[in-house]
């Protein structure tokens, strides 16, 4: 039962952070930012937010981390939870890793 509650909270955070970033974070207006996933700690105190950017990933990640206080404040006004977790933005590199694995598999196929 606890996992269902945790997943529900992760979904609530994901939906609202995506909206806040796309509509309200001024220094990312010219960049396509996609929130790929959320991982909320079991004690609800920390939240890793996995994102991808259309360009300048490291620079935009810094901008997003600078805006994390503002985003947390906006979340608190929307969600009305007793405690809003600290937000930690991270670049999601799953796509790049999957491409690398595919390339390795193709090389193995060619060798046979």
UniProtKB/Swiss-Prot annotation:
Subcellular location: Cytoplasm
Keywords noted in UniProt: Cytoplasm, Ribosome biogenesis
Any one Gene Ontology BP term: maturation of SSU-rRNA
Tagged with keyword Cytoplasm: yes
Gene3D superfamilies: 3.30.300.20
An example molecular function term from Gene Ontology annotations: ribosomal small subunit binding
Cellular compartments per GO CC: cytosol
Record keyword Cytoplasm present: yes
Classification via InterPro entries: KH_dom-like_a/b (IPR015946), RbfA (IPR000238), RbfA_dom_sf (IPR023799), Ribosome-bd_factorA_CS (IPR020053)
PROSITE patterns in alphabetical order: RBFA
Bilayer-spanning residue ranges: none
Pfam family of the protein (one): RBFA
Disulfide bonds: none
PANTHER family: RIBOSOME-BINDING FACTOR A, CHLOROPLASTIC-RELATED (PTHR33515:SF1)
Function: One of several proteins that assist in the late maturation steps of the functional core of the 30S ribosomal subunit. Associates with free 30S ribosomal subunits (but not with 30S subunits that are part of 70S ribosomes or polysomes). Required for efficient processing of 16S rRNA. May interact with the 5'-terminal helix region of 16S rRNA.
NCBIfam families noted in UniProt: rbfA (TIGR00082)
Subunit field text: Monomer. Binds 30S ribosomal subunits, but not 50S ribosomal subunits or 70S ribosomes.
Membership in a protein family: Belongs to the RbfA family.
Record-given protein name: Ribosome-binding factor A
Organism: Mycoplasmopsis pulmonis (strain UAB CTIP) (Mycoplasma pulmonis)
Gene name as annotated: rbfA
């Amino acid at each position: 039962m606890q996992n269902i509650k945790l997943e529900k909270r992760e979904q609530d955070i994901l939906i609202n952070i995506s909206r806040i970033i796309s509509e309200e974070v001024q220094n990312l207006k010219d960049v396509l930012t996609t929130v790929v996933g959320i991982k909320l700690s079991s004690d609800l105190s920390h939240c890793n937010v996995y994102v991808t950017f259309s360009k300048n990933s490291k620079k935009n990640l810094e901008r997003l981390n600078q805006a994390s206080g503002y985003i947390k404040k906006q979340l608190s006004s929307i969600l009305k939870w007793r405690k809003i977790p600290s937000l930690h933005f991270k670049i999601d590199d799953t796509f790049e890793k999957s491409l690398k694995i595919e390339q390795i598999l193709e090389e193995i196929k060619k060798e046979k």
